[in-house]
Curated annotation (Swiss-Prot):
GO terms for biological process: translation. SUPFAM superfamilies: Zn-binding ribosomal proteins. Keywords: Ribonucleoprotein, Ribosomal protein. InterPro entries: Ribosomal_bL32, Ribosomal_bL32_bact, Ribosomal_zn-bd. Transmembrane segments: none annotated. GO terms for molecular function: structural constituent of ribosome. GO terms for cellular component: large ribosomal subunit. This is Large ribosomal subunit protein bL32. HAMAP family: Ribosomal_bL32.
Length: 60
């Protein structure tokens, strides 16, 4: 059975653990139709447009 040769230091353990629980950064672009922030390559949830065409009907 595999056994570690040396004990991992506390700082090394914490440094590795921080990367697991770090929040994921989400890319944001601006909708050319309404100017609201949206995710790239997705339909705008505020106006329903994607690529200059209306995909979703947003009721006001």
């Amino acid at each position: 059975m595999a056994v570690p040769k040396q004990k991992r230091s506390r700082s090394r353990t914490h440094h590795k653990r921080v990367k697991i629980y770090r929040p994921i950064k989400v890319a944001v672009s601006v909708c050319p139709n309404c100017g609201e922030p949206k995710e790239p390559h997705r339909v705008c949830l505020h106006c329903g447009y994607y690529g200059g065409k209306q995909i979703l009907e947003i009721g006001e």
